[in-house]
Amino acid sequence: MIFKVLAASLFGMTCAAKDGSQYPLSYGEAWAGPVRFADNFNLSSNSTGFTMAEATLVMPHLSIPKKPHKEVDEYTASFWIGLDGVLSSDIVRGLWQAGVIMSVWPNGTTQYTGFHEWIPDDPIDVSSSKLAISEGDHIHVVLKTTNNGYHGSTTLTNLNTSRTYTHSQNAANLWRGPTFPAQGATAEWIVEAGTYLNTTQYVFPNWGTASFLNARACNEKGKCSLPGDGNKKQGEMTAVFWNDTKTLYTKSYITGDRVSVEYIEKHQPSVANA
């Protein structure tokens, strides 16, 4: 799911620390985790910002939440890194993302499935025969783009089993419509309440804490940024709040190149009280 925001809609306070707490908070019903804006990137130009993003995703234990947004037959979250997920509405760009879709059922069965997606195309699942993933596994995910964001590649490596899946493709395009390059205005490290192909939105499981290790994003000259090392105008921290239940479901932290996204169920009257 692509996340479109305007700076004026952001909530939060800033401080001098470079741990992500200096970023404005942005509340929605889908994303949890940090967004890092590329330095000196101009959205109206054809310049390229980040051309690589990576992190190692640690597969958390999943359980049925005590107070979910609603009760369902399957609780799911997508756990991913991306390029170009935060855009203004007048720019034709496509989110290039890869990671793991995590699900748990009431009988305790769990499933961890690798995926990649270039929005607006549908996600492509990675079968377990190509990349088996289990609780506790460390999945190193790398996204790259070339040709000014019109071509991309990804690798997902299970560091516990040494199995690697690779994929490359051109940018998504609509039939007789525009092409959606990922020119790297932003990089993201996110746990998301995404949507199934029938457009029904996921309901989060309880994942405790989902960790991204060795997270960074780099431009084509090799200059790299960490998720939380920007100033207050170079990033934002997203969090999931549902107004109908008056509940905040996530809280995120950054320490160096490590991102931690915690599942919580905190009742509060509004996001102003977060």
Feature roles, as predicted:
Residues 1-19:
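Fungal secretory targeting signals
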Residues 15-274:
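Exposed, interaction-prone regions of secreted/extracellular proteins
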